[in-house]
Amino acid sequence: PTISKIIGKDFTEYGVSVVNVRGTGLRRFAKILQRADAGETLDIRVSCMTDRDVMPNCAPAICIDQRYSDIALWPEKEKRNWKAECDFISQNERDLYLERILERANGQRVKTFVANHWTFEYDLAYAGLADELIEAIVAVRYESKNREQRIKDIQKKCEEFPDNESKSAYLYSFFSLKGTSKAEVAQHLSFILETKYASDPKALCERLPPYIRDAINYVTEQEDA
């Protein structure tokens, strides 16, 4: 809700509610808002946001186990609960994987928006909000007297990585390896974004992952007369 408010699409004004379905699953939630008879479609636009759940190839070593810097040491696909980009042998296979995600909830006025790269937090960092994410992570993990130095330390560590993928994966490792609460980080991130971008919504919009912008736009679009 904070992001939508900052970029001038306040969910409250549009009558939009946010629901975290968590373990319920998109498909079950979407079915509540879909009708068996297409002629009785509910006149309610619904955006379902979900992770892509495909790691960049660098992420297993950064976010799971350092040994996985050698792909030969990865467990067989059938014996692990994660996927990486190199698991797909063709673009067609990637496209089919994405289609299956979309099919879980798409239909009638319900539309699914899948993370452009991996997860919500990773995509925020990848798209341009890495510094804000660092600040939020530090606010959750460290006492106020240590935060300024911790931010510098993490930023310096990020500079050691060769590309945006590995830098963003490193920031995600604070959740996957170090147990940082995503919910608490989200709360702090909301405050940080509002403080930094309330007077410059265009700058925030430019730094948002495209799928988040699209999901917000879909539920706040004005209907044609």
Predicted features along the sequence, with ranges:
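Acidic, divalent-metal-binding catalytic cores of TOPRIM
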Residues: 1-225
